[in-house]
Every structure is written in C-alpha cells, then in structure tokens.
C-alpha cells in the first residue's frame, strides 16, 4: 500500500496500550518514511526505554512497529496519506536528525499535557514535528515552545481524556509514567487530561490539509480488514459492507 501510494512518508498510528475504557483506540503514532536509513518505511518515533528510563528517537522497522500491541485486543493501524507538498515537507522534517532531537523532551509522561514542555509523550513529539514541517518556524532555539504556540494558533485540539474517577488522577502522583503537575489546575479539578493522541493528530491533519486519504486496518482471528475513509472500523474488527477482508497468512 505504501509503495503504491507514490508518497515518501505517511503518518501511522497503532493500537498498543488498551485504552478502551477511555474510548480510545490508538495510543501511538510516528512517521513511516520510505527513505529512512534504517530500512525503507521504518517508523521514526519517540520511544521510552524502560531500562534507560528516558525517551529517545527510535527508527523501528514497520513490521516491528505493527506487532507491538496488547494481545488482549485486536491489532489496529491507521495510515494518513497526504498530498505531495505536505508530504515532502513532513518527510524532510522527520528525517532531520538534529531537529528530531531538538524537539525531544527530556522527561516522558504518557499523559503529558499537550501545551507544556515539562513532559512529552510520543504523539506530542509527532504534533510538534508537524508544526516545524508546516509552520516555517525558525530553528535556532526554544523549539518546543515555538511548536506548541504554532499548534495552538492553528487550532490543534488535544484529546480530552475523562478521568471519571478520582483515583485515576490520584494514581498520577504514584505511577512513574503518569504525571499531573504539568496539567492546569482547572483540568485536574474537572478530572480531564488534555493529551496529544493519534486521534487528535488525525483530526488536525484532516482539518488543515485537503485531499488526505485515510486507510485503517485491523487483524483478528487470522484475517485482515481494510477500511478506507474517516469513519472507523467497528469495534471488534468487524468488516463493513465496503471493506476488504484478506487472510492474514
């Protein structure tokens, strides 16, 4: 699919952590790049290494990226294919090793507030890279603040994660990769975390760029469902009447 698209890059998201209790399907996004020096179409992403206890930029082979998910849920992947001008700018930025690191935060938080530089999650890094790809921002200093200011000025809306029960906010003080101090106090009072998630990135791209194609796929019971369009495959990886269904092997 990627080779046939004629593009050199795409935004790719996958299911990983089971977030269905928050009605969230996709947890992790990155840039799949045809000219990645690792292997063609490897995914450049922010990766948190548990052993090193710090984030880094990681180029992961596409198959490895797709296989990283919670075995208790179907495996889902979503791909955005953009027109050439936006794709070219995105690919150039994503392959810029210096900029990729400049936009890497020092401290990781899975629920990082989207408009703070205290922490960062993997999707926040993707959003901030898009700001530099499309925003003509100067790359001399204060990289993350510039990116976030541009995103806010261009109507980027992070995902509202409703922590309905007080304990979810409370454990943010206890679990190493969840934090609350970067979130506005009014959000904490409302038990809302505003976080960069793949759905927020997709909605931003959809609203900003014309003629974006979206392809969603899922794997369950040794079959692959392929769906085209902005609506989602039904929960449980159930094919719709216009979806393609292929054997997984």
Regions found by a protein language model. Give the residues of each.
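A substrate-binding/cap region within the structured catalytic cores of diverse enzymes
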Residues: 69-119, 123
């Amino acid at each position: 699919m990627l080779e046939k698209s004629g593009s050199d890059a795409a935004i790719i998201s996958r299911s990983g952590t089971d977030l269905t209790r928050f009605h969230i399907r996709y947890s992790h996004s990155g840039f799949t790049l045809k000219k990645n020096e690792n292997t063609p179409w490897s995914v450049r992403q922010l990766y948190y290494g548990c052993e090193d206890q710090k984030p880094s930029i990681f180029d992961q082979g596409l198959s490895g990226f797709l296989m990283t998910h919670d075995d208790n849920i179907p495996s889902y992947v979503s791909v955005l294919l953009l027109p050439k001008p936006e794709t070219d700018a995105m690919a150039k930025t994503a392959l810029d090793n210096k900029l990729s690191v400049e936009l890497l935060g020092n401290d990781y938080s899975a629920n990082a507030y989207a408009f703070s530089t205290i922490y960062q999650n993997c999707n926040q890094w993707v959003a901030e890279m898009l700001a530099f790809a499309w925003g003509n921002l100067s790359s001399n200093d204060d990289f993350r603040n510039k990116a976030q200011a541009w995103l806010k000025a261009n109507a980027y809306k992070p995902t509202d994660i409703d922590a309905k029960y007080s304990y979810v906010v409370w454990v943010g003080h206890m679990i190493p990769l969840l934090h609350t101090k970067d979130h506005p106090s009014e959000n904490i009072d409302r038990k809302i975390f505003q976080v960069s998630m793949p759905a927020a990135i997709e909605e931003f791209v959809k609203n900003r760029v014309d003629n974006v194609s979206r392809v969603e796929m899922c794997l369950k019971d040794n079959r692959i469902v392929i769906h085209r369009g902005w609506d989602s495959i039904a929960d449980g990886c159930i094919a719709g009447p216009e979806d393609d269904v292929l054997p997984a092997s």
